[in-house]
């Protein structure tokens, strides 16, 4: 895959990979992982699309300098600018977890108008369900804003998120899940800048339900696919059903025997649904 860089007007950078030719299809990974979340489906999709795989800010090789605000509004601005630059004015977009929230926020703000949108398991308008480990990691990152604690806590965060976590994210114990998590945190230990920036983001990201998104769904006047996992405890099917009821042009597909790492648990199914929906 080709590695490229996008530079936002405020200097923030997005590192992204491209594979294939055809209409651009951007796939936005979940919080805490990287573009590698989509590796199992890239080969299949690249026969039909120019697959665009960014590392979102604070992830991978993308922006992590603490000079930026890292508010939801800032994330949506950078994301919208990137998609406009890399994929054009009406991109095909797939988004998972927190990236799905950012995509809907960008649409509500009028800065993103996708031709088609695929929303994969996410809390969306509901209060996020976090495991004890995730709550611990969030507390560690919030504390990194204290001067002198950033480098120490970056090591603590890397130790708290072990590769074995990948086993809990995949219901099929998919090969590669541990490597995915290992790659996602390999640059965290000792990275004081990233720790401080994560602390900003953790402090400024809403911790409760985001009910304002309920007003955005009826305004999404383009085709939307809710591609859901049947065994992701943090993102039950009821979330997708609530969204479906409010969409003017929505459809729901549920993949059996899939968990949080939906593209690892059923890469064939995910690729099939994306091709069928995005054309």
Positions of PLM-derived features:
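Conserved HGGG/HGGXW glycine-rich cap/lid loop of the alpha/beta-hydrolase fold
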Residues: 12-61
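Hydrolases whose catalytic domains are alpha/beta-hydrolase-1, hotdog thioesterase
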Residues: 102-106
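Flexible "cap/lid" loop of the alpha/beta hydrolase fold
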Residues: 108, 115-149
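Conserved alpha/beta-hydrolase catalytic His-Asp/Glu region
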Residues: 119, 128, 151-219
């Amino acid at each position: 895959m080709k590695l490229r860089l996008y530079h936002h007007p405020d200097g923030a950078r997005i590192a992204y990979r491209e594979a294939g030719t055809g209409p651009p299809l951007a796939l936005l990974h979940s919080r805490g992982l990287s573009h590698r979340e989509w590796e199992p489906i890239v080969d299949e999709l690249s026969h039909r699309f120019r697959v665009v795989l960014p590392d979102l800010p604070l992830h991978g090789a993308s922006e992590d300098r603490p000079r930026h605000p890292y508010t939801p509004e800032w994330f949506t601005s950078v994301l919208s600018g990137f998609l406009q630059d890399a994929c054009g004015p009406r991109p095909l977009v797939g988004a998972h977890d927190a990236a799905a929230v950012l995509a809907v926020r960008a649409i509500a703000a009028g800065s993103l108008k996708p031709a088609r949108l695929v929303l994969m398991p996410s809390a969306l308008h509901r209060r996020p369900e976090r495991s004890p480990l995730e709550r611990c990691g969030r507390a560690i990152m919030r504390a990194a804003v204290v001067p002198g604690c950033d480098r120490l806590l970056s090591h603590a965060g890397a130790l708290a998120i072990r590769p074995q976590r990948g086993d809990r994210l995949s219901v099929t114990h998919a090969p590669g899940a541990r490597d995915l998590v290992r790659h996602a945190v390999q640059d965290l230990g000792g990275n004081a800048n990233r720790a401080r920036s994560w602390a900003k983001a953790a402090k400024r990201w809403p911790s409760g339900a985001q009910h304002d998104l309920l007003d955005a769904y009826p305004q999404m006047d383009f085709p939307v696919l809710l591609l859901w996992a049947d065994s992701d405890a943090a993102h039950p099917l009821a979330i997708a059903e609530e969204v479906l009821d409010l969409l003017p042009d929505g459809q729901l597909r549920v993949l059996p025997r899939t968990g949080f790492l939906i593209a690892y648990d059923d890469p064939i199914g995910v690729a099939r649904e994306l091709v069928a929906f995005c054309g």
